[in-house]
Structure formats: structure tokens, C-alpha cells
Amino acid sequence: MSSENSRNKSRPAVHAAEIVREYGPFGSATQVHGVTHDGRRVWAATGAKLVAFDPASGETSQTLDVPCDAGTAFDGKHIYQIAESRIDKIDPATGKVLASIPAPGNGYDSGLTWAEGSLWVGQYRDRKIHQVDPETGAVVRTIESNRFVTGVTWVDGELWHGTWEAEESDIRRIDPKTGAVLERLEMPRGAGVSGLESDGADLFYAGGGSSGKVRAVRRPTTGRQH
């Protein structure tokens, strides 16, 4: 194989992101900092309130008054929410904080997701994704990225994360062992990603930062693991 072919083979597949739908803004909220999906509803972290909405109707079904200035995750029973330098474990029925652990970035964390019994925490400017013990906050391992990390999600064994630098933003699939970029979905210019979660099927939900919106983005079918 020639070096040119080798270079082409290693380049990630790049697609224009297909935005299926936009939701929000939500009430008086002007920001979306984190997003998760509980199997039925999408949750958006808007700074002082977690807002749950039905992705079919777009209607808000619940709000929780909790600090929520970065990533959000759901483990099947509880919500995990970054609040400054900590990660709170929250009862979604009541909003009660059941436990807290230190966030690895000490206030500079962004994305958050749950997979394989661990929390996965994005560190924005450090361009890192940490696997974190949800009981203690200890960092189990770290994956390096080459872009600012603004959201993290796992789906079907694939690790995806959002990026946002200046007016450019994308959703990218990376190799969880090496951090190599395997695939990129380029968002329209100015449509930043602040929080990312998969619905476990065909869609990503991406926070839209200061737009106050959440965008549903089609997950590509190419390259999926079976």
C-alpha cells in the first residue's frame, strides 16, 4: 500500500450533520449546558434548572431546581449532573441530591455520560475524556482528544464526543483506546455543541449553548458495529 493510500485510509469519514429537529428555548433559560436521555425523555441542563421534555411532542414534562452548569448523565435510575467542581447524583423524581463526588477537572469539566458502570467526563480545554468511578470520583483512565470536548456519549460500543471551537463544531466518533478520530459530523457554522447524548438508537441530542436549544442529529448508519 502506498503512503498516499495509507493516509487516505486513516482519514476520518466526514459528513454534514443532519439536524432532524430543534427544541427550545426552555422558558427563560438562555443556555443549554448538558443533555441526557432517560429512555423516554430528554433532559437539558439550563444552569439553574434541569428540564425534561418529550422528544415526540417537544412539550416540557418536568423541571428540577438544581445547579446544572455542565454535563448531564442517566444511569438507568439516577441523574448525574456536573455542578461547578462536583458531580451530583440526583433522584429524578424529587430533585434530591443523594450523593456528590469531585469532578476530575475541578470546575473545568464539560460533557458527562454513563456507560459500563462508569461515568465518562469530558474536560473542555484540556481536550480529555476521563473514565470515573461513580462512587469515589477516582479517575480510572483518560482518553486524549485533539479538540475541545463539549459532550460525551457511548452507543453500541462507540464513543462519540462533541467539539466546539470558535464558530466550528462537530460530533465525532473516536477510538476509545487511542483517541484517533474515526468519523465526524460537521455542524452548521455557528451551531455549537454543548452537551451530547444518544437515544440508544438513531439520534444524538446535542445542546446548543447560548441558543438555548437542543438539536436532534441523525446518527449515521455507516461504520456501525453489529
Report residues per predicted region.
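A short helix->beta-strand "capping" segment at the edge of beta-propeller domains
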Residues: 7-29
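A short beta-strand motif characteristic of beta-propeller blades
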Residues: 18-26, 59-64, 96-102, 138-143, ...
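WD40 beta-propeller blade core
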Residues: 51-52, 88, 130, 172, ...
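Short loop/turn segments that connect beta-strands within beta-propeller blades
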Residues: 54-58, 91-95, 133-137, 175-179, ...
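Blade-level signature of beta-propeller repeat domains, shared across WD40, Kelch, NHL, RCC1
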Residues: 193-226
